[in-house]
């Protein structure tokens, strides 16, 4: 059983504040939610279990029980998850406020301990102080957190997470902030709490405390497309697709890291809760993570033999050719932008090959093919430029004054001509490596200009950002029929 979840269940009965703050979906009536196989810790109840996606950010960080309340760590309502979430630079005073919140919600004194023990001793089998019956009293106060970086902002979700060695398929990683506070001060807080426990429970409390307060922080993970709802990933091929998210909001005017102080001002806290409401947003999927996901899907379907072929049709329209026909049944081709990029990239590459190398048919096996597989993955800049450089070297360039040149005297389509004029200013007959890189970047940037894209999607924005963008009608970036250049 998750210690934090058990503590919330038992402590919510001691007063009105706790009954409101410590209410978890996992301790209420179960409601069905989409089943998944993603393993990790639910940020709401801190138990390790199968996770489902959050309706506020579409990331997998909530269990199927807690999902009924739709709480997200990016919310603006001061529920327990939001009050445990800190942002960016965390100071010693912030951590002191967090510890004070824990002490307020999970008090430990002789009266509380006796009350829980008396309530638990219902049968003879419960007369001994066994850990399974008193799990809620064994919640130490630690500065253990799950952290994540979203477009330059780092979030720390504090809690008590059991079984730290279990499988973690979420983008969150364990971070210990005890060094920012003070180990000895935190020890003193926990030793005082531990002194009220029966001797048989003190050892277990101490073991739990030291294991969760002395661990080494993990390296922070990189957020990728697999961390978001499969429903979003499956619809990326639709250019007009918008993600629907809901956020729990209120008139919370505190600084982000000061929300935990509200439990000290009970009347003010309940006044803020009276303003609670749900806001709905429809946001664009445009970001580097999802763009890279789409380009990678298209990269797996590349037919490199087209660059040596004599087909009169565009690369995605070749049929009945064993070496060049692209499988158009994949949904990635439903996005006309991906199709346009693929056609123009391969039209340009074929013109380079035909202008510089004597290869007559697509059935031939050439070394250049192995470098073509990465030409769409422009998000991985180093790998992409390496593949372009290798392709350039396969064209047998001529070197003059330490600069290598290749010819461009083969026919190209009008789209590529427009890109050449836009990027170079004319349709050249001689190109350097830098020219080739610039042209191929321009072909991709016409639809997916990653230079000006945020890394993560808008679903990871805070309420303040979403409201500002919604006011300026920018939650949907642009009409799907208009390119980034336009």
From Swiss-Prot:
Disulfide bonds: none annotated. Interacts (via C-terminus) with host IRF3; this interaction leads to IRF3 degradation. Interacts with host IRF7; this interaction leads to IRF7 degradation. Interacts with host CUL1 and CUL3. Interacts with host BTRC. It comes from Rotavirus A (isolate RVA/Human/Japan/IGV-80-3/XXXX/GXP[X]) (RV-A). Belongs to the rotavirus NSP1 family. Residues 42-79 are annotated as: Zinc-binding domain. Pfam families: Rota_NS53. It is found in: Host cytoplasm, Host cytoskeleton. The C-terminal region is phosphorylated by host CKII/CSNK2A1. Phosphorylation of the DSGXS motif is essential for host NF-kappa-B inhibition. Residues 82-176 are annotated as: Important for cytoskeleton localization. This is Non-structural protein 1.
């Amino acid at each position: 059983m998750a210690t934090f979840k058990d503590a919330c269940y038992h402590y919510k009965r001691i007063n009105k504040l706790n009954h409101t703050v410590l209410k978890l979906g996992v301790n209420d009536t179960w409601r069905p939610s989409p089943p998944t196989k993603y393993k990790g810790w639910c940020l709401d109840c801190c138990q390790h279990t199968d996770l489902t996606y959050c309706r506020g950010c579409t990331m997998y960080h909530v269990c199927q029980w807690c999902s009924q309340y739709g709480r997200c760590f990016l919310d603006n309502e001061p529920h327990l998850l939001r009050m445990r979430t800190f942002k960016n630079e965390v100071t010693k005073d912030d951590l002191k406020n967090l510890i004070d919140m824990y002490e307020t919600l999970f008090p430990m004194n002789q009266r509380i301990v006796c009350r829980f023990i008396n309530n638990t001793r219902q049968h003879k089998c419960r007369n001994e102080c066994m850990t399974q019956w008193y799990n809620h009293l064994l919640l130490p106060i630690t500065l253990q957190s799950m952290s994540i970086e979203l477009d330059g902002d780092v979030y720390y979700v504090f809690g008590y997470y059991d079984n730290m060695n279990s499988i973690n398929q979420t983008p969150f990683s364990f971070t210990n902030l005890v060094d920012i506070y003070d180990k000895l001060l935190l020890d003193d807080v926990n030793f005082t709490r531990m002194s009220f426990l029966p001797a048989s429970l003190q050892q277990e409390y101490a073991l739990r405390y030291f294991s969760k307060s002395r661990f080494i922080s993990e390296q922070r993970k990189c957020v990728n497309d697999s961390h978001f709802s499969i429903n979003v990933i499956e619809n990326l091929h639709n250019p007009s697709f918008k993600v629907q998210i809901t956020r729990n909001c209120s008139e919370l005017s505190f600084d982000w890291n000061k929300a935990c102080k509200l439990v000290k001002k009970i009347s003010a806290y309940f006044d803020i809760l009276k303003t609670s409401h749900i806001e709905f947003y429809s946001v664009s999927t445009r970001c580097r993570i999802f763009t890279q996901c789409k380009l990678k899907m298209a990269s797996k379907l590349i037919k490199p033999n087209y660059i040596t072929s004599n087909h009169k049709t565009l690369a995605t329209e070749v049929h009945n050719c064993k070496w060049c026909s692209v499988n158009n049944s994949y949904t990635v081709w439903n996005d006309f932008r991906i199709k346009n990029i693929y056609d123009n990239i391969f039209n340009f590459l074929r013109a380079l090959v035909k202008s510089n190398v004597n290869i007559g048919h697509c059935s031939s096996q050439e070394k250049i093919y192995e470098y073509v597989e990465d030409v769409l993955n422009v998000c991985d800049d180093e790998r992409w430029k390496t593949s372009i450089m290798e392709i350039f070297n396969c064209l047998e360039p001529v070197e003059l004054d330490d600069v290598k040149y290749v010819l461009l005297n083969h026919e190209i389509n009008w789209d590529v001509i427009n890109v050449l004029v836009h990027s170079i200013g004319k349709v050249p007959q001689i190109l350097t490596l830098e020219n080739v890189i610039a042209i191929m970047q321009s072909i991709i940037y016409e639809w997916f200009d990653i230079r000006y894209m945020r890394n993560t999607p808008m679903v990871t924005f805070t309420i303040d950002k979403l409201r500002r963008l919604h006011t300026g009608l920018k939650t949907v970036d642009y009409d799907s029929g208009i390119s980034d250049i336009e």
